[in-house]
A protein has these predicted regions:
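Extreme N-terminus of proteins, especially the signal/transit-peptide cleavage junction
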Residues: 1-2, 288
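Short amphipathic alpha-helical patches
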Residues: 33, 320-321
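Noncatalytic, basic helical substrate-engagement surface that gates or grips nucleic-acid strands
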Residues: 2-162, 166, 177-186, 190-192
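Extended two-metal-dependent nuclease catalytic cores across DNA- and RNA-processing enzymes
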Residues: 88, 111-320
Length: 321
């Protein structure tokens, strides 16, 4: 059996670029002009607490990178270690490109992965990505690296190979196939079957898990990292208590899918809803169409034209409507 380490290059590049710089802030008082450096905003706020308001200061983020060769070395070391941990004979590296189809989904409130442009990116991220490209990384346009990792896992199962998705992204927990999260796992893990979900041990009002139930949970709960939350389409709230209330005792795919459908029906009791999307456009969708939209957010494409069909799935498992 051929074993391949399928690497999420986006994560490797980001982590190594971030590790190769020191971050701090400079706070300047708007009236006096006096400036002071702090390691982070928490330290700054602690010093001015009870003395000044944060609004009295201009705060600037400062990023100080080390020599780029250290970041390159970090990426080489990481990828070599991934290959060895997976006991792979070769490795593949994928990087995100342009035109992710999910960016165009008419989600309410906020665009898919919205607000990420406001995040501070490592100074050397572009150079690290370019280095991986020159090392043979493949650019994925039209969808995400997560989709490509899911595709390679599916192709491995189809062809009798062991393609191991090397990523720390939680979305992979809902994809059938081999996965290796080098920050949490001592060795690759096979994700298969219905699986299970449980409260996230570090993040409040979030969950963790694996298998198809993890996907079903994302389908109805959403993903705070990717900025989609199905209950927002109806202006409702839905947390982990509600999530476990509908999925905890489900033992089969049919029970899970029925529970997900029933929750969407509670949000959209008339069967149709009209809402305003993040870009200001107005849309009218049926329950199934809304479920299709959110499934598109959570479902990783196993091939380029792999489209999730809610209607067909509901009919296949015999969901009562």
């Amino acid at each position: 059996m051929k074993t391949v380490a399928v690497v999420d290059g986006d994560i490797v590049a980001y982590r190594c670029a971030a590790a190769n710089e020191t971050r701090s802030i400079v706070a300047t008082h708007k009236v006096t002009g006096q400036s002071q450096s702090f390691p982070h905003r928490t330290a700054f706020r602690a010093q001015i607490q009870g003395l000044y308001e944060e609004s009295e200061y201009d705060v600037v983020d400062v990023q100080t990178p080390e020599d780029i060769s250290h970041a390159f070395h970090g990426m080489n070391t990481t990828i070599k270690a991934l290959k060895e941990s997976c006991k792979a004979i070769t490795r593949e590296i994928y990087l995100s490109g342009k035109d992710n189809f999910r960016d165009k989904l008419p989600l309410p409130v906020i665009q898919y992965k919205g607000n990420r442009s406001e995040m501070i990116r490592p100074v050397q991220l572009k150079e690290c990505r370019e280095y991986l490209k020159n090392s043979g990384a493949i650019i994925i346009d039209g969808r995400e690296v997560d989709d490509m990792l899911a595709q390679r896992c599916w192709e491995g199962k189809r062809d009798g190979h062991k393609n191991i998705a090397c990523t720390i992204d939680g979305d992979q927990h809902g994809v059938e196939g081999w996965m290796y999260n080098w920050t949490k796992m001592s060795e690759p893990k096979l994700i298969q079957g219905l699986g299970d979900i449980w409260p996230h041990e570090k993040i409040k009002n979030d969950f963790d898990g694996y298998g198809r139930k993890f996907f079903y949970a994302q389908w109805v709960f959403g993903d705070p990292v990717d900025k989609f939350k199905p209950c927002q389409i109806a202006g409702k709230k839905f947390g982990v208590v509600g999530l476990f209330g509908i999925l905890k005792d489900c033992k089969t795919d049919k029970e899970c899918i029925q529970a997900v459908y029933d929750q969407y029906k509670r949000w959209i009791p008339d069967g149709v809803i009209t809402y305003k999307a993040w870009d200001g456009t107005e849309h009218t969708k049926t329950i199934v169409e809304v479920m299709d939209m959110y499934a598109a957010c959570a479902h990783m494409k196993r091939w380029e034209d792999d489209v999730f069909n809610t209607e067909a799935l509901l009919d296949k498992v015999g969901v009562k409507r």
